[in-house]
């Protein structure tokens, strides 16, 4: 399966990639449902989850929305770069939300649902809250608010399907993506795969490397990259590793290495043709180099591509190169109320991620049939008590 159009929601990834840079021109296409109100013409955004392992906490996304204290951010020598502004924020620790609000000029709220009706879009920026996304986003989806939900979306297919149900029933677009889906190498590799199909090539296999050192949070970097290139027609998956998290916790084991294997049941892409022969894509996940490589083997030879390392003292170009396309994808969804990836594609990505997790945790890295994953199987959270359930009433 592949990113596809679902109803009137467009999701052609190449169209999006080529138009994302001009997305601010789409403001006039906003519906009345999402039209910002008040003095500002900017899209009003609410953010939640500002603590450990949050893209907002590390100043990755926030300065792309708001100028810190109304001025140019000391780490970011730039002015406004998007058509969005963070107006409200929430965190499980109200003091942290207050500090964020003071820094970026927005309003901190005490309850997770206090932003409903006050924002045009919601960004769920954390990782530790993933186990509770299904509850945290419910009131926003029920209100029809477009929601960006950070990877890996859900820890069970039951929760993933509930989020999708709420999205569909309330016409509330959702987005779950990763910056490695937007890098140039992913686009070039996808186009190359399509060309191989048009040329009648037979795929023999592929090998890849990924920066990630822990499956639960950053393993999706590599997984989502591969799915952006080859699609989601994965029949079986395995994950061999010595752990799954970056540190030891009461529920987690420390991970230093991992190997992901995707068994594709052939390959088919609209307008490009198909290849019926099954093949395996293998990816070595290591720590800590921030790069991705891919080599594709076919019946006429090899083709490879590499995403150069982006580590270094100057994080400014790295952050913009990697993270800005994701922020623009949020803006596009908030403005147009269209989904880039279909609900089916989001569910496919989540199912493959969870099946690999199950392979590691319960089957010593054996290949598991993706379709056989029970909806109620739940992957562990490294911080199982991160959210106090009493906040949900």
Predicted features and spans:
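C-terminal substrate-binding/catalytic lobe of Rossmann-fold NAD(P)-dependent oxidoreductases
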Residues: 263-265, 271-326
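N-terminal secretory signal peptides and thylakoid transit peptides that target proteins
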Residues: 2-23
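Rossmann-like dinucleotide-binding domain that binds NAD(P)(H)
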Residues: 90, 204-278, 282-289, 344-351
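Conserved acidic residues
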Residues: 87, 120, 204
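C-terminal helix-rich "cap/oligomerization" subdomain common to oxidoreductases
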Residues: 18-38, 114, 122-124, 333-393
């Amino acid at each position: 399966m592949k990113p596809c159009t679902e109803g009137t929601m467009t999701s052609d990834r190449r169209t999006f990639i080529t138009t994302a840079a001009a997305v601010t021109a789409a403001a006039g296409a906003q519906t009345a449902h999402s039209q910002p109100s008040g003095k500002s013409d900017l899209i009003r955004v609410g953010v939640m989850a500002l603590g450990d392992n949050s893209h907002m906490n590390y100043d990755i996304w926030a300065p792309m929305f708001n100028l810190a204290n109304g001025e140019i951010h000391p780490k970011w020598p730039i002015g406004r770069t998007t058509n969005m502004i963070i107006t409200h924020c929430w965190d499980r620790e109200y003091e942290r939300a207050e500090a964020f609000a003071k820094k970026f000029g927005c309003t901190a709220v005490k309850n997770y649902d206090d932003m409903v009706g006050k924002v045009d879009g919601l960004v769920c920026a954390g990782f530790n809250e993933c186990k509770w996304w299904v509850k945290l986003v419910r009131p926003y989806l029920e209100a029809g608010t477009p929601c960006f939900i950070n990877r890996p979306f859900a820890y069970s297919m039951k929760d993933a399907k509930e989020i999708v149900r709420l999205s569909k029933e309330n016409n509330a677009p959702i987005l779950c993506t990763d910056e490695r889906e937007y890098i140039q190498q992913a686009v070039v590799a996808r186009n190359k795969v399509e060309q191989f199909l048009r040329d009648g090539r037979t795929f023999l296999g592929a090998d890849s490397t990924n920066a990630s050192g822990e499956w639960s949070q950053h393993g999706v970097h590599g997984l989502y990259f591969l799915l952006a290139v080859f699609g989601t027609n994965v029949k079986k998956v395995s994950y061999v590793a010595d752990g799954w998290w970056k540190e030891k916790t009461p529920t987690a084991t420390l991970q230093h290495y991992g190997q992901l294997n995707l068994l594709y049941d052939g390959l088919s892409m609209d307008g490009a043709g198909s290849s019926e022969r099954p093949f395996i894509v293998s990816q070595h996940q290591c720590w800590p180099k921030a790069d991705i490589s891919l080599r594709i083997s076919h019946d006429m030879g090899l083709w490879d591509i590499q995403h150069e390392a982006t580590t270094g003292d100057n994080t400014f170009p790295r952050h913009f190169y990697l993270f800005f396309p994701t922020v623009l994808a949020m803006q596009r969804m908030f403005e147009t109320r269209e989904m880039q990836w279909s609900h089916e594609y989001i569910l496919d990505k989540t199912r493959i991620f969870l099946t690999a997790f199950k392979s590691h945790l319960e089957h010593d890295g054996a290949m598991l049939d993706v379709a056989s994953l029970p909806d109620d199987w739940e992957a562990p959270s490294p911080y199982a008590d991160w959210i106090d359930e009493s906040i949900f009433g």
